[in-house]
Amino acid sequence: NGTCVAPVVPPPATCEPACDACQTCDTRGETPVCVDHCAPGLVCERGTCVAPIVPPPATCEPACGDCQRCDTTGESPVCVNNCADGLLCEAGRCVAPVVPPPPTCDPACGPCQVCDTTGAAPVCLDACGDDELCMGGLCRPVGMHAGFDALAGPFADGPAVTTQCLECHPNEGHDFLQTAHWRWAGPTPNLEGHEGETNLGKRTLINNFCIATDSNETRCTQCHAGYGWRDDTFNFEDPTKIDCLVCHADGASGYAKATGTAGAPVPAADLTLAARSVGRPTRDNCGACHFYAGGGDNVKKGDLGSALKNATVEMDVHLGRGMECADCHAADNHRVLGQGAHIGVTQGSLDCSNCHGGSPHANGLLNNHALDVACQTCHVPAFSRQQPTKMNWDWSTAGNRTRGNNGVEQGTTADGTTVTVYDAMKGDFVWEKNVRPEYAWYDGRVRRMMTDDTYPAGTGADAGDPIVLGTPLADHADADAKIWPFKVMRGRQAVDPVRTLVLVPKLFGPGGFWPAIPAAAAYTPEAVRALWTSSLTAGARTAGQIRADESYTDDAWTWAYTEMWMGIEHEVAPPAEALGCQDCHANPAFDFTALGYACDPLVGNNCGSRH
């Protein structure tokens, strides 16, 4: 109002209610607010910011012991173990307890035993059941013979086991004495010139492997199902000399025949174990001899070697599916069915059609072919597919230890398989693998040389004109014949060109060729020739080829080429691997003219087709 006066200043803003002693009123905002001015963790006491009084932590009373801790998470502190489960507290540390070793048997238990610790003292108990035997360190199921008291042994020798077998099986013993397996001879209805005879067979034949059994029985009869056949005094009517175990003992029992002992078991054989393991023959039993025929693994037949012991379907469709040899070959009265073309003995026929029938194919054209072509011809496209076989054996070079490593030389087959190509005991060999068979007409009839047969004079001097030791007889004109596959074994061996005899050498034992082969330092061709002369004299005398008072001289014998045909029956391949049309027809490598055809019936006219 025209007068100078002091302005009216509003009172400062204040906090309502008033702030505490340790607070200030912050008026910077729209509304005053009290804020603490004590630092974090401090409390206000009597207008001063001070640290709070913290009560002491809770503790366990009494204090916890070693390996414990005080747990204060609950209402009241409590001591708890600080060791993990299973640990113990020792000297203030958590440690694993010392566990005493479990009780054990001392001495330790043997194979097929378990240590029983449930009693006061550990004791070893047999783990095998009543129908099991310990063989090869394993409990193996066996037949009912396992528990027979009569087979508890001990047995002094093989005949002692056989004697016990005959107590229950006298008829079986009698039957076996009549078999070709036992006599190595039997009916030969298909053997040219010997159709009505029953005393010919393996022991009267000559071959181009180890030649003949005469004078070599002690070695050869390692594969005879008997004991003690050392010479012509062996009693084929004595059933106690039958070796039941070689055909019936479980292979895992360890039973085997020793080399050069006329069929005696190996010294390590457990005859009691073998006797208690007997059962139906398996391929191990049959293969113990047949896989090693001719002096070695797969040497002879070419379709029977040790690879078939654990055959796959690719190796052999029958054995690869678990079949045993006896499934096809066993007959009544211990007879074995079948006839090898190189043996000529039969005690019953065996043919694929026995199981598969005469028209096994869905394709009529194939069934039509089967009228004239054996099943094996197409279904065994090659033999010795898994392991090599001998295809040629030249005895004329034997006796030279200056060759190779003390008379042994190694080589390889076409696929790189290592084989022995020379052995001073036996000469030079040719091995082959995955061999395409040779083919011929066959109706079961064969021609086969015995040790007393003569060969056509003049043959054998050249490999192209060999002495034929064995061959099928049929040809294209024989209505019942079929084209069959064969392994043709070729070789060179000693002959008497004057008597035209294929000579039997004594190879094994005293007076034989093998033990007298000179050392490398003493080798001369003349010394080996003289050794052969002595060996041939001894063998020919035993075989009846010369008189007991006759002897050969070095110039009275010579070497000749030979061949022997053997039928191929095993190693049946899967169907997809069977021969097809063009494997034979329109194939220049297939020799139709050798089979009696004028030409290939598929591509020519008037060739001589039979179907």
Where are these regions (language model features)?
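Sequence context of c-type cytochrome heme-c attachment sites
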Residues: R140-T282, A288-S349, S353-N367, V488-R490, ...
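Short, disulfide-bonded extracellular cysteine-rich repeat modules
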Residues: N1-P7, D26-V35, V43-P52, D71-V80, ...
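Non-catalytic interaction/regulatory modules that flank or connect domains
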Residues: R448-A516, A520-T524
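Disulfide-braced loops of extracellular cysteine-rich modules
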Residues: T14-C22, C34-V43, T59-C67, C79-L88, ...
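Repeat-solenoid scaffold signature
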Residues: G348-P472
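Divalent metal-coordination and catalytic microenvironments
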Residues: F176, C378, F486, C584
